Swiss-Prot record:
Keywords: Cell cycle, Cell division. It comes from Methylibium petroleiphilum (strain ATCC BAA-1232 / LMG 22953 / PM1). Transmembrane segments: none annotated. One of its GO terms (biological process) is regulation of division septum assembly. Belongs to the MinE family. This is Cell division topological specificity factor.
Length: 88
């Protein structure tokens, strides 16, 4: 948008706005964050198991790490199944 367009109050055409949005979506998907599971989640899950194992006896399959998108946020969800003795 040029300075003259800005001062005169010209609005962008719908097609150009849609094109810009599509370019942003494509760039996001190409960066590896659109829909695929990030590489660090596996390492994060292993480290969580190691830290929690210091205090509670758990197995690696007792912890689940999931990343999901909600609106403009990325939510990291960690589910942990504690053994009966630890629930106390």
């Amino acid at each position: 948008m040029s300075l003259l367009s800005f001062l005169l109050g010209e609005k962008k055409k719908t097609a150009s706005v849609a094109k810009e949005r599509l370019q942003i979506i494509l760039a996001h998907e190409r960066s590896g964050r659109g829909g695929s599971r990030p590489d660090y989640l596996e390492a994060l899950q292993r480290e969580l198991v190691a830290v929690i194992s210091k205090y509670v006896s758990i197995k690696p399959e007792d912890i689940k790490v999931h990343l999901q998108k909600q609106d403009n946020l990325e939510v990291l969800e960690v589910k942990l199944e504690l053994p009966e003795a630890a629930r106390g």
